From Swiss-Prot:
Keyword DNA-binding among record annotations: no
First and last residue of the signal peptide: 1-31
UniProt protein name: Cysteine and tyrosine-rich protein 1
InterPro entries reported for this sequence: CYYR1
Gene: cyyr1
Topology relative to the membrane: Single-pass type I membrane protein
Primary location class: membrane
Lineage: Eukaryota, Metazoa, Chordata, Craniata, Vertebrata
Residue intervals annotated with topology Extracellular: 32-62
Length: 158
């Protein structure tokens, strides 16, 4: 009686040999490049390949723009996380910059000390008053007292 383990091993080797033989026989035939003649790659035998394999190592514009968009997007995400972490750390302690003290913020929100500025007048304009344009006066639309243009010379309605 034959060992069941050796029988399964023989079946496995038979499958490998037949698969290898099939690959070798199929590999010797010519590739069908009828549908992809523009992208038929050189080789023995010639084979159909994708556009990017046909172009080679040169990246297309779409691929480059996708890479640039991805890098910029990741940089923005990293910057947002960095700002969030910085703001959270900053809120736990006082500000290191002196201009953000509470007295400065109160001064800005309540107005500067001292008298208010003078009211705005046209005396401070760049041009003197005599160079200003005249006031706007709407004009009445003109009536159409002209004849229509002549007909197009290349087309006749006869």
């Amino acid at each position: 009686m034959e060992n069941p383990r050796s029988a399964s091993l023989q079946k496995s080797w038979k499958f490998v040999r037949e698969s290898l033989l099939l690959c070798l026989i199929a590999g010797r035939g010519e590739a069908q490049c009828d549908g992809c003649i523009e992208y038929c790659c050189d080789g023995v035998p010639p084979f159909c390949c994708s556009y990017y394999a046909y172009v080679g190592d040169v990246l297309s514009g779409t691929a480059i723009s996708g890479i640039v968009f991805g890098v910029v997007f990741l940089m923005g995400a990293v910057a947002a996380v960095f700002l969030c972490v910085c703001m959270c750390v900053k809120n736990s302690r006082g500000s290191r910059v002196g201009v953000f003290s509470s007295t400065y913020i109160n001064t800005v929100t309540q107005g500067y000390p001292g008298p208010p500025p003078p009211p705005y007048s046209y005396d401070h304009e760049m041009f003197p008053p005599d160079l200003r344009p005249p006031p706007y006066t709407p004009t009445v639309p003109r009536s159409a007292n002209y004849s229509p243009p002549p007909p197009y010379p290349g087309f006749s309605r006869k």
